[in-house]
């Protein structure tokens, strides 16, 4: 299946409202888990694990579920660290995608990384090494904010 076909079949394409999503900057031993998208949107781009909030879920429940589905890891979401907006328009200027993403600072609790079909790669990286990767916009800022928040809570 091509990326264009994947996007055409995605109900989040050409939405009537923004799509709410969560992500997690998960830290273990000073490193953060970075994943690479294996399908559209943003195929091949490095980002944080996460996904859509389902009806009736709290944000915390959603991020725990999404991380477990994508990576098999158990996490403790600690606190929201801002928000991100991703709006993509087609050649005619129509909104093709609109995501509002709420990232959490999170602690690793347990498990070994096992990726689902949405991801092609995962790696625990030093936050200072993210600049060499092609990442989603603002990823380094989210990771820095999450690291600072977790460090402040340890004091």
PLM regions: where:
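Acidic, metal-coordinating catalytic segment for phosphate/diphosphate chemistry
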Residues: 2-23, 94
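NUDIX/MutT-family hydrolases
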Residues: 114-146
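A generic structural micro-feature
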Residues: 14-18, 45, 94-100, 119
């Amino acid at each position: 299946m091509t990326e264009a076909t994947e996007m055409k079949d995605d109900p989040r394409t050409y939405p009537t409202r923004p799509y709410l999503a969560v992500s997690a900057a998960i830290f273990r031993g000073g490193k953060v888990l970075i994943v690479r998208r294996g399908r559209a949107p943003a195929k091949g781009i490095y980002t944080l694990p996460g996904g859509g909030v389902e009806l009736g879920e709290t944000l915390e429940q959603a991020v725990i579920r999404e991380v477990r589905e994508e990576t098999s890891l158990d996490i403790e979401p600690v606190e929201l660290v801002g928000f991100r907006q991703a709006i993509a328009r087609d050649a005619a200027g129509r909104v093709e995608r609109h995501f509002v993403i709420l990232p959490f600072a999170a602690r690793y609790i347990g498990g070994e990384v096992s990726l689902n079909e949405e991801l092609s790669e995962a790696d625990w990286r030093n936050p200072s090494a993210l600049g060499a990767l092609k990442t989603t916009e603002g990823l380094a800022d989210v990771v820095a904010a999450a690291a600072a928040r977790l460090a402040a809570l340890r004091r």
